[in-house]
Regions:
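Conserved N-terminal segment of class I S-adenosyl-L-methionine
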Residues: 10-95, 251
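A short acidic, Gly/Pro-enriched loop at the edge of an enzyme's catalytic core
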Residues: 95-107
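A short beta-strand submotif of the Rossmann-like class I SAM-dependent methyltransferase core
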Residues: 106-112, 138
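A short glycine-rich, Lys/Arg-flanked "PGG" loop and its adjoining helix->strand segment in the class I
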Residues: 120-135
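Conserved class I S-adenosyl-L-methionine
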Residues: 136-169
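Acceptor-substrate binding/catalytic loop of class I
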Residues: 172-190
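A C-terminal cap/extension of S-adenosyl-L-methionine-dependent methyltransferases
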Residues: 191, 195-258
Length: 258
């Protein structure tokens, strides 16, 4: 019961999610919870290491930076959000990015793709702005047996894998979403993706993080276990790796421009 209680978030009025103040509150929560902050740090470090191993040069941009703190880990990153946030370098929509053709080395997004109302438009922009060999690095909700149970029953965001279209009606940048969009684009409709975006290629689709985020309490609940057990939980997750296609809550997706 503790697990289910912890997962349940407010179902009613979600308009507060679209306020910049809410995003800053989320940032303070992340920074104040060592277990949750460490999850973000590990994800940021993975991206930074991958990016720095690439031979390409150019701008590295985070889209939908929100309350994150990637710049503390990777100082040269240009942070951005659709909302006016004092902690971000730029404000713009993923549908219309203010960068020249073939100018970006990398685009990083953490739990952002499934909030973008028109992903075809975003991917067109990514295809335009990325240089040859540049890449999009995304960490997104996974669509697994376990994640469907969690996201459909205990999370406020829609999680509907039955819809045909990648687009959805949006009243606000955070209150509207569909958590299955990454799975739709890069698994169910991969052939369509390849046809629509001939210059882009799926390179990595990897499931991970089945239990760690739940135990952190996320943004809405307290930690379920103390921070000193983080290493043990990481070890347990490694043991569970063969089951990730069934139990992972997140996935890393890397798309490269040919």
């Amino acid at each position: 019961h503790c697990f289910l209680y912890f997962c349940r978030v407010m179902e009613n009025n979600l308009s507060h999610l679209d306020l910049p103040e809410t995003t800053m509150t989320h940032r303070n929560i992340i920074l104040s919870k060592p277990f949750l902050k460490r999850i973000y740090i590990d994800w940021y470090v993975e991206f930074k290491n991958f990016s720095q191993q690439q031979s390409t040069t150019g701008k590295v941009v985070e889209i939908g930076s929100g309350g994150g703190f990637l710049k503390e880990i990777y100082p040269s990153v240009i942070t951005s959000d659709i909302m006016p946030l004092s902690v971000c370098d730029m404000q713009f929509s993923a549908h219309e990015m203010p960068f020249e053709n073939n100018s970006l080395k990398a685009i990083f997004m953490l739990n952002v793709l499934h909030h973008i109302p028109d992903n075809e438009q975003f991917l067109q922009e990514a295809q335009r702005t990325l240089q040859k060999g540049g890449f999009i690095y995304m960490i997104e909700p996974a669509n697994t047996f376990f994640s469907r149970f969690i996201y459909k029953n205990f999370h406020h965001e829609p999680f509907d894998e039955t819809v045909a279209d990648w687009k959805f009606e949006s009243k606000g940048p955070l209150s509207d979403a569909n958590g299955t969009i990454p799975w739709m684009i890069f698994k169910r409709d991969l052939k369509k993706f390849n046809q629509l975006f001939p210059e882009l290629e799926l390179e990595v689709f990897r499931h991970h993080t089945p239990i760690k985020y739940l135990l952190s309490g996320g943004l809405s609940k307290p930690n379920l276990i103390p921070y000193f057990l983080f290493g043990l939980v990481t070890f347990i997750e490694k043991l569970l790796t063969p089951l990730n296609s069934k139990i992972a809550l997140f996935q890393t997706i890397i798309v490269r421009k040919k």
